[in-house]
UniProtKB/Swiss-Prot annotation:
GO terms for molecular function: DNA-binding transcription activator activity, RNA polymerase II-specific; DNA-binding transcription factor activity, RNA polymerase II-specific; identical protein binding; RNA polymerase II cis-regulatory region sequence-specific DNA binding; RNA polymerase II-specific DNA-binding transcription factor binding; zinc ion binding. SUPFAM superfamilies: Leucine zipper domain, Zn2/Cys6 DNA-binding domain. It comes from Saccharomyces cerevisiae (strain ATCC 204508 / S288c) (Baker's yeast). GO terms for biological process: DNA-templated transcription; galactose metabolic process; positive regulation of transcription by RNA polymerase II; regulation of transcription from RNA polymerase II promoter by galactose. This is Regulatory protein GAL4. One of its GO terms (cellular component) is transcription repressor complex. Zn(2+) 2 binds at residues 11, 28, 31, 38. InterPro entries: bZIP_sf, Fungal_SecMet_Regulators, Gal4_dimer_dom, Transcription_factor_dom_fun, Zn2-C6_fun-type_DNA-bd_sf, Zn2Cys6_DnaBD. Gene3D superfamilies: 1.20.5.170, Zn(2)-C6 fungal-type DNA-binding domain (4.10.240.10).
């Protein structure tokens, strides 16, 4: 241990026991010998109790009170000082500052006059405080900071030179007119005619890792031939009812911006339509989303409805405003985001949020207003639009345009119910809005405070990440990951949509942590001078903690997405979200891998990073089977950037598919330095004809040793104790620990059973029979589906009646999900197969195929006899002569 001269006094234990301290780090000699906790408290500095010192403190306090009254002339200082939490004081004063000082020029003039009237000593104190930016950042959690820029969310940063197009005026122009375009703008690192993507965007990150767009090749998902594109067929009642059912089943539970009872009454012509153009925009957008949620991008049926919706976007539409238009424009923004029209999505969202503000949706109605249904509809629409604003701004690296919210969060109670203690489809948007609102308060405000002079310090990053995790801990119990398996299983049987909501909230939380820490390390690398890099011990420790937390958040994201894919049926909507969060997370190990290659880091860490990258590649290739073009593009980017490492000797080979000749099934394996256990996956429907069993990184255990490697009894005991379990033995947890840092396994999740409505051309227009049930996700609606054994149609309609039944209040919406059994996949062994446990959960899948807990649990006397007396396979004992 090294003696540190900076330690001024003995450790706490030595001072308490009156012992001579060696003043060593991390432990002094006495504490090390007696196994005591060694802690060095800072030396207490006591102020002198003199009249001169008290007079100086009183004068400083008086000037501070005068400054407070000049900035907040209408506030009661005594009332504010009675508040216990410093964070509450900061939030209150920041909100007051925004309300009182909307005009920045007026605020600047006021502060300039305040500075002129300041005494000379106070101005000198302000200058000294500015010069010591590092000290002020360390004391940021104890001091109250009010900033003009932070309050107004003003962004003073300029566009970097490498982001500039050739033409500074017209070079940012963009065009996304082609509805079948294969280009993804944030994968085009060329800044010309691509729009602006700022710091923190995926395009900026791709530039930093050296992605070259000239090596990128466009690739289309194999589209099924659209046999019939007759507009009358696609506009028929039977077709639109199926697509409407798909929207309400596959998308509405996760974005309940549409009031489904009103939607059904409009669809059934039970209420009058105020504007046919506005209704056609909304209705066709819903049909486009419903078609996309069934077949992804394998057909262009959804494009037909999208083009039909655009045809109604006339000049009259933008000369009016309504709730229907706000909802329709928001859904168009969501849809075009999936269809790789990022700038178009941003434009639709801009129209939507500005129109929502013009309708006053960002403010609550008077307390005397008694209709709670209307109040809740307004809140749901606003918070859906607000959450999308934050997500797009972070994704594209563009400024957040909203600075304040005076409207309450929506209620989690359905319109049919009065009170509820269980989950509803509105819990997702409530917790997402709460998470993003807290994030913008604690990160965006603090980020602009330190702007260009000093980046956010490591301590503040850790505080922000802790605040983000604290929000998730305040969520309802059924949305947290530490809920009991039994309780969660019962909830998922009644509410099958809840599983994806829980996972998506976790992914959003981890993506925000990645965003904060990634931005910190970008500034830390670019703006830190050599003098600032010579930090003290606790600063470097906090930077290391940030690095560990960043890699841990990325790894937890990959593990969580893998866990979800292993235990749930995946739809195109789920696949798109999984691929986005996977790609965002894998950029962290890629950046680390490139940094280590420049600094000649250890091969062990490189192998672990490559293993994680290959795991993501494997998952993306599985997601690509769900007809999502974005997955193919992500795979190309990863393979192009990591090609030098994947082809090197230390790289882990990419997943390959080996076919079993007996049954034609495909099994994917990863070959690497560490053995990765396989565990079964739930059968996927409507994906392909090959049953794929792929390796998951969730379980890492010892590789099984050969059954016969010696002839002694001790060797027999050793081998039998390590023998892999038979199919009749229970699945146990591997006794070895992974070589990399372990991640807390995710708790049990039942398979999420989705009521999908296939929309292939054969299914729509004849030639296929399907057995599907049809329930709408909304609690007050139900569709009646009938199966025809002799006809090709999924829905049998009457000539003189509507295809959809009238809305009916139902206490149980998902009765068809209650009777479904979760079946595990089978392990193929020649011609014999035996199913595993019928109730797979995330935890059992995570710990699958471990070694047996006992020594002879799966051993029979035949095994012992064959081991001892089978001379054909048993080699002679080398010690025996």
């Amino acid at each position: 241990m090294k003696l540190l001269s900076s330690i001024e006094q003995a450790c706490d234990i030595c001072r308490l026991k009156k012992l001579k301290c060696s003043k060593e780090k991390p432990k002094c000699a006495k504490c090390l010998k007696n196994n005591w906790e060694c802690r060095y408290s800072p030396k207490t500095k006591r102020s002198p109790l003199t009249r001169a010192h008290l007079t100086e403190v009183e004068s400083r306090l008086e000037r501070l009170e005068q400054l407070f009254l000049l900035i907040f002339p209408r506030e009661d200082l005594d009332m504010i000082l009675k508040m216990d939490s410093l964070q509450d004081i900061k939030a209150l004063l920041t909100g007051l500052f925004v309300q009182d000082n909307v005009n920045k020029d007026a605020v600047t003039d006021r502060l300039a006059s305040v500075e002129t009237d300041m005494p000379l000593t106070l101005r000198q104190h302000r200058i000294s405080a500015t010069s010591s930016s590092e000290e002020s950042s360390n004391k940021g959690q104890r001091q109250l900071t009010v900033s003009i820029d932070s309050a107004a969310h003003h962004d003073n940063s300029t566009i970097p030179l490498d982001f500039m197009p050739r033409d500074a005026l017209h070079g940012f122009d963009w065009s996304e007119e082609d509805d079948m375009s294969d280009g993804l703008p944030f994968l085009k690192t060329d800044p010309n005619n691509n729009g602006f993507f700022g710091d923190g965007s995926l395009l900026c990150i791709l530039r930093s890792i050296g992605f070259k767009p000239e090596n990128y090749t466009n690739s289309n998902v194999n589209r099924l031939p659209t046999m019939i594109t007759d507009r009358y067929t696609l506009a028929s009642r039977s077709t639109t009812s199926r697509l409407l059912q798909s929207y309400l089943n596959n998308f509405h539970p996760y974005c309940p911006i549409v009031h489904s009872p009103t939607l059904m009454m409009l669809y059934n012509n039970q209420i009058e339509i105020a504007s046919k153009d506005q209704w056609q925009i909304l209705f066709n957008c819903i049909l486009a989303i419903g078609a996309w949620c069934i077949e992804g991008e394998s057909t262009d049926i959804d494009v037909f409805y999208y083009q039909n919706a655009k045809s109604h976007l006339t000049s009259k539409v933008f000369e009016s405003g309504s709730i229907i238009l706000v909802t329709a424009l928001h859904l168009l923004s969501r849809y075009t985001q999936w269809r790789q029209k990022t700038n178009t999505s941003y434009n639709f969202h801009s129209f939507s949020i500005r129109m929502a503000i013009s309708l006053g949706l960002n403010r609550d109605l008077p307390s005397s207003f008694s209709d709670s249904s209307i109040l809740e509809q307004r809140r749901r629409i606003w918070w859906s639009v607000y959450s999308w604003e934050i997500q797009l701004s972070l994704l594209y690296g563009r400024s957040i345009q909203l600075s304040q919210n005076t409207i309450s969060f929506p209620s989690s109670v359905d319109d049919v119910q009065r009170t509820t203690t269980g989950p509803t489809i509105y819990h997702g948007i409530i917790e997402t809005a709460r998470l993003l609102q807290v994030f913008t308060k604690i990160y965006e405000l603090d980020k602009t405070v330190t702007a260009e002079k000093s980046p956010i310090c490591a301590k503040k990053c850790l505080m922000i990440c802790n605040e983000i995790e604290e929000v998730s801990r305040q969520a309802p119990k059924f949305l947290q990951m530490d809920i009991s398996t039994t309780a969660l299983t019962n909830l998922l049987k009644e509410h099958p949509w809840l599983s994806f909501t829980r996972f998506e909230l976790k992914w959003k939380q981890l993506s925000l942590i990645i965003y904060v820490l990634r931005d910190f390390f970008t500034n830390f690398t670019q703006k830190k001078s050599q003098l600032e890099q010579d930090q003290n011990d606790h600063q470097s420790y906090e930077v290391k903690r940030c690095s560990i937390m960043l890699s841990d958040a990325a790894q937890r994201t990959v593990m969580s997405v893998s866990s979800y894919m292993d235990n749930h049926n995946v739809t195109p909507y789920f696949a798109w979200n999984c691929s986005y969060y996977l790609f965002n997370a894998v950029l962290v190990p890629i950046k680390t891998l490139l940094s280590n290659s420049k600094s000649n880091a250890e091969n062990n860490e490189t192998a672990q990073l490559l293993q994680q990258i290959n795991t993501v590649l494997m998952l993306l290739k599985k997601l690509a089977t769900f007809k999502i073009q974005t997955c193919e593009k992500y795979i190309q980017v990863l393979e192009e950037v990591c090609a030098p490492f994947l082809l090197s000797q230390c790289a882990i080979p990419l997943p390959h598919i080996s076919y079993n000749n007996s049954n034609g099934s495909a099994i994917k394996n990863i070959v690497g330095s560490a053995t990765i256990a396989q565990y079964p996956t739930l059968p996927e429907e409507n994906v392909n004809n090959i049953s794929v069993k792929y390796v998951s990184p969730g379980s890492v255990g010892p590789s099984p040793v050969p059954l016969k490697s010696g002839a002694s009894f001790s060797d027999l005991v050793k081998l039998l104790s390590n023998r892999p379990p038979s199919r009749n033995s229970p699945v146990t947890i591997p006794r070895s620990t992974p070589s990399h840092r372990s991640v807390t396994p995710f708790l049990g999740q039942q398979q999420q059973l989705q009521s999908l409505v296939p929309l292939t051309p054969s299914a729509l227009f004849g030639g296929a029979n399907f057995n599907q049930s049809g329930n709408i996700a909304d609690s007050s609606l139900s569709f009646t589906f009938t199966n025809s054994s002799n006809g090709p149609n999924l829905i049998t309609t009457q000539t003189n009646s509507q295809a959809l039944s009238q809305p009916i209040a139902s206490s149980n919406v998902h009765d068809n999900f209650m009777n479904n059994e979760i079946t595990a996949s089978k392990i193929d062994d020649g011609n014999n197969s035996k199913p595993l446990s019928p109730g797979w959960t995330d935890q059992t899948a995570y710990n699958a195929f471990g070694i047996t807990t006992g020594m002879f649990n799966t051993t029979t006397m035949d095994d012992v006899y064959n081991y001892l007396f089978d001379d054909e396979d048993t080699p002679p004992n080398p010690k025996k002569e």
